Regions:
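Juxtamembrane intracellular "pre-TM" segments in multi-pass secondary transporters
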Residues: 182-216
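A late C-terminal transmembrane helix in Major Facilitator Superfamily
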Residues: 327-362
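Interfacial helix-cap and linker-helix signal at transmembrane-aqueous boundaries
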Residues: 29-30, 61-62, 146-154, 239-240, ...
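Structural signature of the two symmetry-related core transmembrane helices
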Residues: 69-83, 278-292
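Extracytoplasmic gate region of multi-pass secondary transporters
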Residues: 22-23, 213-254, 258-260
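Helix-to-loop junctions at the C-terminal end of transmembrane segments
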Residues: 54-66, 263-275, 360
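Cytoplasmic helix-loop-helix junction between adjacent transmembrane helices
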Residues: 99-135
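Helix-loop-helix hairpin linking two adjacent transmembrane segments in secondary transporters
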Residues: 131-180
Length: 404
C-alpha cells in the first residue's frame, strides 16, 4: 500500500491544504489582513477557474510531459506556495497564490491517475486510486487539527508553515517511491496497443462525445459537481433557515470527513473485486438515499446525508478513473480524467447558479435540495447502465519507459 499512501499524502497537500486550508483559516487571518467580502468572492471564482484551467491543460498537453517529474514539480510548487502564504498580507498576492495552488492541485491529481494506471496491477488500481483520492478527506481532518492545536499555540501563520513543510516531506517520499517504480506487468490478454498511447489533442473531444465510457465518465462528474458543490455551499445556510442548531452543520461535516477517510479503501476494494458498476451503484445509492432522508426530515437525517456525501464524493474519483482505465491506456485515462474535472466544475457552477436562482425566486432553499436529490437519482441510473453494460477491457501492454 506504499503507492496509494504516498499519493494520498499528495492529495492532502494539493487539495486538503492547497484548496481548503485558506477557507478554514480565513476567520483567523482576517484579524491581520484587510480583505473584503468582494475579494473573498473573487478568490472563490478565480480558484475554481484555475482548477478548471489546470485540468483542461493537463487533458490537452499532459501526455507530452513526464508525469513522474510533473508530480514532483507540482509538489514542490505547492509546498513553496503554502510556505509563502504565511508571509503574505496583500489580498492581490494572496489571490494569485491561491489561484496557482488550485491549478497545481488539478495537475497533481491527473499525474496520480496516470502513474497509478500505468504502474499498479490491474486488480489493485481502483483500490489505489480511491485511497489516493480519499486523501482529500484526510486533509479536511488535518485542517481541523491545525485550527484546534496549531493556531491557538503558534498562530495562523504557523499553520501555513506546517502545511508547507509537510508538503516538502511528501515530495521527498514521492521521489523515493518514483525512483524505483516500474510499470505493471502485461496482462495475459495483452494486445498490440501500447499502455502509454495518447489520444491526439484534435480527437480528444470527439472521443469523449463519441465513445460510451469517456462520455459516461464525464456525465458522472458533471452530475457529481451539480449535486455536491451546491450541497456543500448551501447546507449550513439551509440548516440556519430551518432554525436548526449551528452545531448540526459541524457534526454533519465531521461525518463527511470521517466517512471519506475510510470509504476510499472499502469502495475501491469493492470495485476491484466486484466490478466498477457495483461500486458506483453502492456509492451513488448511498448518496441518493441520504439526500432522500434529508429532504424528508433535515434535522433528523442531516448526519445521514453527510454519511452518503462522504461515501460517494471522495472515492468516486478513483473508481471512475479505474473504470476508464479498463478501456483506455494510462495516458488516455489521464487525458479523460482532466476533462472529467472540467465537467465537474461546470456542473458545480450550474448547480450553484440554479440554487441561487431558486432561492432568489422562492425565498427558500427547500426546493434546491429536491433538485439535488433528483440529480442524485440520475447518478444511480447511470450506475445501473454501467452495471449492465459491456465490461470488456481493451487489451494493453506496458511501455518500456519508467515512471520518469
Amino acid at each position: 500500500m506504499r503507492m496509494p499512501t504516498t499519493f494520498g499524502m499528495n492529495q492532502i497537500v494539493s487539495h486538503g491544504f492547497g484548496m481548503f486550508l485558506f477557507a478554514a483559516l480565513m476567520p483567523f487571518m482576517r484579524e491581520a489582513i484587510e480583505i473584503s467580502a468582494w475579494q473573498l468572492a473573487t478568490i472563490g471564482a478565480l480558484t475554481q477557474l484555475a482548477y478548471l484551467g489546470g485540468a483542461m491543460l493537463l487533458g490537452l498537453v499532459g501526455h507530452r510531459l513526464g508525469t513522474g517529474r510533473l508530480a514532483l514539480l507540482t509538489g514542490i510548487f505547492s509546498s513553496a506556495l503554502l510556505l509563502c502564504m504565511s508571509q503574505l498580507r496583500d489580498p492581490l498576492l494572496i489571490t494569485l497564490t491561491l489561484t496557482c495552488l488550485a491549478a497545481s492541485a488539478a495537475i497533481s491529481w491527473g499525474c496520480i491517475v496516470e502513474i497509478v494506471s500505468r504502474c499498479a496491477r490491474a486488480e489493485q488500481r481502483s483500490t489505489y486510486l480511491s485511497c489516493a483520492s480519499s486523501g482529500t478527506a484526510w486533509g479536511y481532518a488535518l485542517n481541523g487539527l491545525l485550527i484546534l492545536v496549531v493556531v491557538p499555540l503558534l498562530g495562523w501563520q504557523a499553520s501555513w508553515q506546517v502545511a508547507g513543510l509537510f508538503g516538502l516531506l511528501v515530495v521527498a517520499l514521492t521521489w523515493h517511491m518514483l525512483r524505483d517504480l516500474k510499470s505493471a506487468p502485461a496482462c495475459p490478454t495483452a494486445g498490440p496497443a501500447p499502455v502509454d498511447a495518447a489520444i491526439p489533442t484534435s480527437k480528444l473531444f470527439a472521443t469523449i462525445i463519441g465513445e460510451r465510457t469517456a462520455l459516461f465518465a464525464c456525465l458522472i462528474c458533471l452530475l457529481v459537481g451539480f449535486t455536491t458543490m451546491p450541497f456543500s455551499y448551501w447546507l449550513n445556510t439551509y440548516l440556519d433557515e430551518l432554525s436548526l442548531p449551528a452545531a448540526l452543520g459541524g457534526y454533519t461535516w465531521a461525518t463527511v470527513g470521517g466517512t471519506g477517510m475510510v470509504a476510499g479503501f472499502i469502495t475501491g476494494k469493492l470495485a476491484d473485486r466486484r466490478g466498477h458498476g457495483t461500486a458506483l451503484m453502492v456509492i451513488f445509492s448511498g448518496f441518493a438515499l441520504g439526500l432522500l432522508a434529508f429532504i424528508l426530515d433535515p434535522g433528523r437525517f442531516a448526519l445521514v446525508a453527510g454519511f452518503g456525501y462522504g461515501l460517494m464524493y471522495f472515492p468516486m474519483w478513483g473508481i471512475v478513473a479505474g473504470w476508464v482505465n479498463q478501456h483506455y491506456s494510462s495516458t488516455a485515462t489521464m487525458q479523460i480524467s482532466g476533462i472529467c474535472m472540467v465537467t465537474f466544475g461546470l456542473g458545480g457552477t450550474l448547480g450553484n447558479l440554479l440554487a441561487g436562482y431558486i432561492r432568489e425566486t422562492t425565498g427558500s432553499l427547500h426546493d434546491v435540495f429536491f433538485v439535488l436529490t433528483a440529480a442524485s437519482l440520475l447518478l444511480v441510473a447511470l450506475a445501473i447502465v454501467i452495471l449492465r453494460g459491456n465490461r470488456k477491457v481493451l487489451p494493453i501492454i506496458p511501455p518500456t519507459a519508467g515512471a520518469f
